[in-house]
Amino acid sequence: MNPRRKSRFKLVIFVVLGIAIASGLMLYALRQNIDLFYTPSEVIQGKDNNPNQKPEVGQRIRVGGMVVEGTVVRDPKSLKVRFDLNDIGPAITVEYEGILPDLFREGQGIVAQGVLTQPTVLTATEVLAKHDENYVPPELGEKMQKVHKPMGIEAADLKGESARDRQEKEGAK
């Protein structure tokens, strides 16, 4: 090999090796940040009822479900909260220390992200409360009522059929 070709060959090897190392480090970093989503039933029974597809203890996961009524236990001396979460099947226990979202309540849908510390216990680092598409924050709802009352708009008008629509229907009859 002549010196020029040898130099190019070394450069190509160096670039390919650099790309391989960078790709490996990126994949490793991404693998650490992947949080798989499960339902409480899937945590206990495995995805598609396959016990081989259960999350492992120590694995970071996200679990979504409904807060079981009567299971919320708050520690009066700290921000620790413990509650059960279920879907249509068995429930898992979620332990969380921090301020819960305003929309958090029993019977409400939530998503908890954290580490599975026991097969049926998730120690959450984050709790997100879900709401339906008709949700209006309380502050905004109050302001809307103040603005719409002087205009002659009622709360029922904001939820579907307006007074004008009702009058048009009655006039068409």
From Swiss-Prot:
Gene3D superfamilies: Nucleic acid-binding proteins (2.40.50.140). The chain crosses the membrane at residues 9-29. The keyword Heme applies. The keyword Lipoprotein does not apply. GO terms for cellular component: plasma membrane. It is a single-pass type II membrane protein. Residues 30-173 are periplasmic. Keywords: Cell inner membrane, Cell membrane, Cytochrome c-type biogenesis, Heme, Iron, Membrane, Metal-binding, Signal-anchor, Transmembrane, Transmembrane helix. It is found in: Cell inner membrane. GO terms for biological process: cytochrome complex assembly. Heme binds at H131, Y135. Residues 1-8 are cytoplasmic. Residues 152-173 are annotated as: Disordered. It comes from the Bacteria. Residues 156-173 have a biased composition (Basic and acidic residues). GO terms for molecular function: heme binding; metal ion binding. Disulfide bonds: none annotated. Belongs to the CcmE/CycJ family. HAMAP family: CcmE. Heme chaperone required for the biogenesis of c-type cytochromes. Transiently binds heme delivered by CcmC and transfers the heme to apo-cytochromes in a process facilitated by CcmF and CcmH. This is Cytochrome c-type biogenesis protein CcmE. It comes from Haemophilus influenzae (strain ATCC 51907 / DSM 11121 / KW20 / Rd). The gene is ccmE.
